């Protein structure tokens, strides 16, 4: 996936900054027993975020949002991500290709860079859900250390919780 397709990369200077950053990737794939339309209805609703996020995160949407996402939608969240410290996260739905994929990108938040693509692919038995995340930590080598010690495992835990929740509702073995 080329970086230049991300909305946050506006010119060659931005692209060069991305190249110098330590970019981390997290990829998840899950098979679910529901139709493409049912999957889109669930994942495109900002109100389902609480169901698929661990309770320790205390996520709440603090901006007024519609029932379904669309390209350009700004979502403002409050969460307690690290040591129970409240933080605000503003993200934008930068791409929306109903009912197959959407991308949200951090505009204000704890990361130097964050892009999360959610892809839904119809199969004979349901759908394949794919999450493709790229992120970079702020504050140079210290951010890289914090990622190694704390953040990477927290992100894994978030997506493990989501996987377990979705499996309990619509789990399907490949």
Q: Could you tell me what each predicted segment is?
A:
Residues 32-34, 79-83, 95, 110, ...:
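Beta-strand elements of well-folded, non-transmembrane domains
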Residues 25-27, 86-90, 112-116:
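Short, surface-exposed coil-to-beta transition loops
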Residues 15-70:
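Hydrophobic ligand-binding cavity/cleft-lining segments
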Residues 106-157:
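Beta-strand/loop substructures that line and gate deep hydrophobic ligand-binding cavities in soluble
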Residues 61-108, 128, 161-174:
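Glycine-rich portal/gate segments that line the openings of hydrophobic small-molecule binding cavities
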């Amino acid at each position: 996936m080329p970086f230049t397709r991300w909305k946050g990369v506006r010119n060659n200077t931005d692209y060069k900054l991305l190249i110098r950053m330590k970019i981390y990737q997290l990829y998840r794939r899950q098979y679910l027993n529901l139709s493409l339309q049912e999957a889109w209805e669930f994942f495109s609703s900002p109100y389902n975020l609480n169901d698929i996020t661990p309770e320790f995160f205390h996520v709440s949407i603090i901006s007024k949002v519609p029932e379904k996402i669309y390209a350009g939608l700004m979502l403002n969240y409050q969460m307690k991500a690290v040591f129970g410290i409240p933080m605000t996260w503003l993200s934008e739905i930068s791409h929306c290709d109903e009912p197959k994929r959407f991308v949200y990108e951090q505009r204000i938040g704890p990361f130097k860079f964050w892009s999360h693509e959610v892809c839904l692919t119809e199969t004979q038995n349901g759908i394949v859900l794919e999450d493709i995340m790229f992120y970079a930590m702020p504050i140079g080598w210290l951010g890289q250390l914090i990622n190694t010690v704390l953040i990477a495992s927290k992100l894994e835990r978030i997506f493990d919780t989501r996987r377990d929740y979705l499996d309990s509702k619509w789990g399907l073995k490949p």
